[in-house]
Regions:
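Single conserved hydrophobic/aromatic residue that forms the stacking wall/gate
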Residues: 1-11
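Amide-donor transfer/coupling interface in amidating biosynthetic enzymes
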Residues: 12-134
């Protein structure tokens, strides 16, 4: 888990982040990440793990959002996925050892106790509301 920050100059006018806090916790676990933004892209959010967590850009007539995290996946499901992929995660050195992996799970379990699920999944809700009105 890491705290992501929506870029202050764009975050309030972005429909994706409507009613979302500017700083929010999110799972930050990626095998790959965006390094170079498209020429016309706007950086929406970032954190200490990934410089690019959210972008907005246009392609022809389409407005495109890209996010490097998963608001649609519950923390409980994340824990299930970590346990399911435990062997591969350890082999790939995603964690130093099993204690490190278990510590990470504990952090997520603690976050479950304090997080507002509606706010954590706000991007998904906002996106669904937008496409419902197209």
């Amino acid at each position: 888990l890491t705290t992501s920050s929506a870029a202050s100059d764009v975050y309030k006018r972005q429909p994706l982040y409507k009613d979302k806090d500017q700083f929010f916790n999110t799972p930050a676990f990626n095998y790959d990440e965006v390094i170079t933004l498209p020429n016309n892209a706007t950086l929406l959010s970032s954190n200490k793990v990934n410089n690019v967590m959210g972008i907005d850009f246009k392609s022809d007539l389409s407005n495109i959002w890209g996010i490097q995290y998963h608001p649609e996946i519950t923390y409980e499901k994340m824990i299930t996925l970590i346990n399911f992929r435990k062997e591969r995660l350890l082999e790939n050195k995603s964690f130093n050892d099993e204690n490190d992996l278990n510590s990470h799970i504990k952090i997520i379990e603690d976050e479950i106790k304090i997080t507002n699920k509606d706010l954590r999944m706000r991007e998904l809700k906002n996106w669904l509301n937008l496409i419902a009105n197209v």
